[in-house]
From Swiss-Prot:
Organism: Clostridium acetobutylicum (strain ATCC 824 / DSM 792 / JCM 1419 / IAM 19013 / LMG 5710 / NBRC 13948 / NRRL B-527 / VKM B-1787 / 2291 / W)
Name recorded for this polypeptide: UPF0251 protein CA_C3166
Disulphide-bonded residues: none
Residue ranges crossing the lipid bilayer per the database entry: none
Alphabetical list of InterPro entries matching this protein: UPF0251 (IPR002852)
Pfam families linked to this entry: DUF134 (PF02001)
Recorded family membership: Belongs to the UPF0251 family.
Amino acid sequence: MSRPTKFRKVDFFPKSTCFIPLGKPKCEVEEIALKIEELEAIRLKDIKELNQEECAAKMEVSRQTFQNIIDSARKKIAIALTEGNAIAIGGGNFKSKFCKFKCLDCRNTYEINCENDKHMCPSCGSNNIVCNKKTGSCENLCK
């Protein structure tokens, strides 16, 4: 029996999640799925220029796991660029300090940094809130 996949910590979510080669309709191109944690690995290593140990620590994984993640990401990006495929960013096994909350009193849904922000509804001020994602990433508020 294989070990369960450990959630990888991610601090960045892209505004754009689909990239299509110029001049090709989306329906005519093959789509490559790039996981959120793969994009985070690329961001930390290639943009932030952190070393492998720092990247692994930020994502809360081993150095070997980080290397596996970034190798997978780079291969997918290389295939998409050389073969003219679209890249769709989403999914994966990750956790984040950002979480969607729902107020049980006024039904407002909102997103906050669950590590730093106050756990009260910005609309009505109620503390009667729950995590709307139920992923465990905000720990005690996920029900």
